[in-house]
Amino acid sequence: MTDGPIKVNSEIGALKTVLLKRPGKELENLVPDYLDGLLFDDIPYLEVAQKEHDHFAQVLREEGVEVLYLEKLAAESIENPQVRSEFIDDVLAESKKTILGHEEEIKALFATLSNQELVDKIMSGVRKEEINPKCTHLVEYMDDKYPFYLDPMPNLYFTRDPQASIGHGITINRMFWRARRRESIFIQYIVKHHPRFKDANIPIWLDRDCPFNIEGGDELVLSKDVLAIGVSERTSAQAIEKLARRIFENPQATFKKVVAIEIPTSRTFMHLDTVFTMIDYDKFTMHSAILKAEGNMNIFIIEYDDVNKDIAIKQSSHLKDTLEDVLGIDDIQFIPTGNGDVIDGAREQWNDGSNTLCIRPGVVVTYDRNYVSNDLLRQKGIKVIEISGSELVRGRGGPRCMSQPLFREDI
């Protein structure tokens, strides 16, 4: 099979192409009163966040990675006027709660913008002061202090979550929180209309119309045969089963097993990749709380049963044994965040110490602030490339969260 624009058969194969989103004006539309609704704990300083992100991108380029930007691809995908019009309609249709019937005024604003300006504006949000329409609804006469007709999308620089590259296909995800649900509309248009992707017959394992929630931070490609997916606050068991069935029924897919790993439903354990990432053939970073749960975990191995022509599910309580079995590795090493210390581990977990981006076997990108975890990784033979993330981390995501691999070399 000839390689297309998407190929990800592992977490550790040499990274060749990655999708990023440079932080933009959406971060400056964060205000204290509405942080919770937009899933932020704090407000990053945009200028510094952009410098940190630019350095992250440059580090990847220096390691031979082609860096693509979501915002640029999205703008290039709506060159056709009809596609642009459909894109605007789709965005507004998913924003009815806030636009209060002012579609035409917002469209008039959009009509003054270039394709890139349009994409940037949709990402950053539309403030009410930008259009000042005549009041036509009773609700508009009320003392509503909410400042936006179109909400900002400050989480977009975490490109891992709205989509996930799996094999030669992709999931276009239905996000759990309303604040993030519109994010996957960009990759939908990119895959369907961008010249780089539109004629590649890319399998869509799940699309954003799927009724079940799934997010890319819970989707890990351990090998060409095995996926690991977190059952979390943001990813449902129903979505995992649907994904497994779609992959198993595709004759071009190589995956034979899907390992569903239940994790606690809290912000500290937002996604599987915030507590667990693969960094070498036999090494994983791991939050100590997961290590302590060993022997009492809910792990489910989903396979296709050729005899019964249906999926079969086996249960396990030991993550180490399960991974060694499905990956065919004798002795997997778990490397604890913050060396498992009750203080260092908790602090560095909060700052995404487990959320490493592997760019080839045994080489990872991490935040420099997680120095205890980074030193331990080096002791275990891992090459650690550190980046500054004092502002980026305020969104509660690390290098893996901020990147969506589109192409990795096979291992």
Swiss-Prot record:
Coiled coil: none
Compartments, record wording: Cytoplasm
Catalytic residues of the enzyme: 401
Leading EC class: hydrolase
UniProt pathway annotation: Amino-acid degradation; L-arginine degradation via ADI pathway; carbamoyl phosphate from L-arginine: step 1/2
GO MF entries: arginine deiminase activity
Keywords assigned by UniProt, alphabetized: Arginine metabolism, Cytoplasm, Hydrolase
An example Gene Ontology biological process: arginine deiminase pathway
Cytoplasm as UniProt keyword: yes
Catalytic activity as recorded in UniProt: L-arginine + H2O = L-citrulline + NH4(+)
Enzyme Commission identifier(s): 3.5.3.6
Family membership: Belongs to the arginine deiminase family.
PANTHER family, sorted: ARGININE DEIMINASE
Name of this protein: Arginine deiminase
Organism the protein comes from: Staphylococcus aureus (strain NCTC 8325 / PS 47)
Gene behind this protein: arcA
